[in-house]
Amino acid sequence: MSPEFPPFLSPCMNITNMLHKCVAWTIEYYSEDVRLEIAAMPFGIRAAYVRLTEMLQEFGLDLRMPHSRAMGGGLFELRPRGKEGIARVFYCTMVGRRIVVLHSFIKKTQETPKRELDVARKRQKEVCGS
């Protein structure tokens, strides 16, 4: 007779995998337009973004420089870089280990343009209520 496993625990799943799946962060997008803007970024930047989001799902708020940076007031930025340039992707977090991607842009200057930051903060207020 084979042992019965609870539906969430298959025989091939070890405890480490189970714990990892339980604590992983989920990533959502403010809108379909935000997701499409990121999908339209140059290949190298997009590849870096995918790698960073995988790290973000695993480490959440523990992801730090040079990959992510706190912008203050609960707003954060991912910092994807490719041979084509540098992008910034703003996000906030919500209860239930949820990350909401708010806005993205390709950097052309050393400083983050105020307009880009304002868009992210406005969306953060709408979504995260902070």
Can you describe what each PLM-predicted range is?
Residues 89:
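Portal/gating segments that form or line small-molecule/metal binding sites
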Residues 102:
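ATP-dependent carboxylate-activation loops
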Residues 2-86, 95-98, 106-130:
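Basic, Lys/Arg-enriched alpha-helical interface segments
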